[in-house]
């Protein structure tokens, strides 16, 4: 995300009138004067985007996706939108006027969708401000750095107005990881150093050849595929890929964290959208030794079945199916809704990095190790690790694999994916594969934070 502020905050006084149709900019300024003042002083920026039909249209859906990373509010509309935005200070509020919209029951339901646990939104007020204009007043718990943008229709979605509310100071994933559970981290370090292991520690498996003897904690980033606006594949019984991938990833994280020499970090820990580039960026910020993206496969024929493992390819895909899958997964940003107005220089560098041969070789090694374990709990769709140009696997210095746990489009495997026992078996199998890989390929020291000595 860009470090440049989208607009400055000015204190224009409280918007405290109870009726939203009476809420207006402070009486000292008319709308035209306020806009002139903004242009002259550069202390207020009002952004207008998009186009609107002359007649009022209908908001077809409103959705709120809270998370500690950011909160997203989405309004789905039948036509393109024209909107105005304004930040107000003391107390902090975000005001959004939407033109050409009727205040219907869908918009009336928006305030009720705000959770008390939302990290950034205290409440939302919505109502008609003047003919053909609906005003949203979002009362905030703290200062934010908003990103507001529109998305064109794709898939089952119509036009969308997206309000992303980020903290004014971006969350550092490394510090968040360390603060998540300081006590458990200290206990893991003590166990790795050979001090008083907990009674609850259980070995991942008793197979020979996977004993780990390393000098520091191994950091593994787990990436539950999809999330938020992007449900991923949907099974015939209505199972969302984003739901099962998060559940499996959480189980795997718990098992990894129970190891004396490993720790896991999730790219998302709840139901919200994370752009592909940010998933990779999170892994690099915590000096990850391994990146694992968890998915559930799908195909037009319900008979397709089995588990698969994929790695990045510098050249072409290893099969037509692998190329098709990579194209499908890489489209996640379009469905989930990424703000193309904010450029990610890290992602640009990553996509241009062509010196990934060594990392890809390591990815193939860990992929082969994990695939061998998956074959013990499920049919393998392909007996070898496949390769294609997955954007989420393009960290140039982190071995990265994408696991298709099963086919959610297959009714039998969809049932497996929602079964707690199968999810647990899947997590165990992946962990065994990880341990086997690191037993043969101990990680090098990357940071003082990771070291045990």
Regions found by a protein language model. Name each.
Residues 2-219:
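Signal-peptide-cleaved, periplasmic/extracellular N-terminal interaction regions immediately downstream
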Residues 77-79, 98-100, 140-142, 165-167, ...:
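Flexible glycine-/small-residue-rich
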Residues 84-85, 105-106, 229-233, 411:
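Short, solvent-exposed loop/turn elements at domain surfaces
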Residues 145, 263, 308, 382-384:
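Residues at or immediately flanking beta-strands
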Residues 189-345, 356-368, 424, 443, ...:
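Catalytic-core regions of hydrolytic enzymes
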Residues 290, 300, 351-453:
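Active-site-adjacent mobile loop/cap segments within catalytic or ligand-binding domains
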């Amino acid at each position: 995300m860009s470090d440049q502020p989208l607009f400055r905050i000015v204190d224009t006084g409280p918007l405290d009138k109870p009726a939203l149709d009476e809420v207006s900019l402070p009486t000292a300024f008319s709308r035209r004067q306020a806009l002139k003042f903004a242009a002259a002083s550069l202390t207020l920026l009002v952004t207008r985007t998009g186009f609107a039909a002359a007649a009022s249209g209908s908001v077809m859906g409103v959705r709120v996706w809270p998370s500690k990373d950011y909160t997203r509010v989405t309004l789905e509309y039948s036509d393109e939108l024209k909107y105005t935005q304004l930040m107000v200070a003391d107390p902090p509020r975000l005001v959004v006027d939407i033109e050409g919209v009727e205040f219907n029951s869908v918009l009336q339901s928006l305030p009720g969708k705000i959770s008390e646990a939302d990290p950034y939104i205290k409440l939302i007020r919505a109502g008609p401000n003047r003919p053909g204009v609906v005003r949203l007043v979002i009362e905030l718990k703290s200062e934010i750095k908003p990103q507001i943008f529109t998305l064109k229709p794709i898939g089952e979605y119509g036009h969308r107005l997206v309000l992303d509310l980020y903290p004014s100071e971006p969350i550092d994933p490394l510090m968040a990881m360390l603060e998540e559970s300081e006590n458990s981290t200290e206990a893991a370090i003590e166990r790795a150093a050979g001090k008083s292991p907990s009674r609850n520690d259980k070995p991942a498996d008793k197979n020979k050849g996977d004993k780990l003897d390393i000098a520091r904690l191994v950091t593994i980033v787990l990436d539950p595929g999809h999330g938020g606006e992007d449900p991923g594949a949907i099974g015939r019984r209505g199972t969302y890929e984003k739901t099962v991938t998060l559940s499996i990833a959480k189980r795997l994280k718990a098992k990894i964290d129970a190891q004396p020499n490993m720790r896991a970090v999730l790219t998302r820990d709840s139901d919200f959208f994370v752009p592909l580039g940010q998933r990779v960026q999170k892994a690099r910020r915590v000096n990850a030794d391994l990146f694992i993206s968890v998915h559930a496969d799908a195909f037009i024929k319900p008979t397709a079945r089995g588990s698969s493992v994929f790695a990045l390819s510098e050249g072409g895909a290893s099969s037509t199916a692998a190329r098709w899958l990579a194209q499908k997964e890489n489209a996640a940003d379009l469905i989930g809704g990424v703000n193309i107005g904010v450029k990610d220089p890290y992602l640009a560098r990553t996509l241009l990095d062509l010196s990934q041969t060594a990392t890809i070789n390591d990815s193939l090694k860990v992929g082969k190790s994990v695939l061998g374990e998956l074959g013990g709990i499920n049919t393998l769709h392909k007996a070898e690790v496949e390769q294609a140009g997955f954007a989420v696997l393009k960290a140039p210095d982190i071995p990265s694999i994408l696991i298709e746990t099963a086919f959610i489009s297959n009714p039998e495997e969809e049932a497996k994916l929602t079964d707690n026992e199968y999810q647990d078996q899947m997590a165990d199998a992946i962990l065994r594969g990880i341990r086997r890989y690191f037993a043969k390929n101990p990680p090098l020291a990357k940071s003082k934070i990771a070291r045990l000595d």
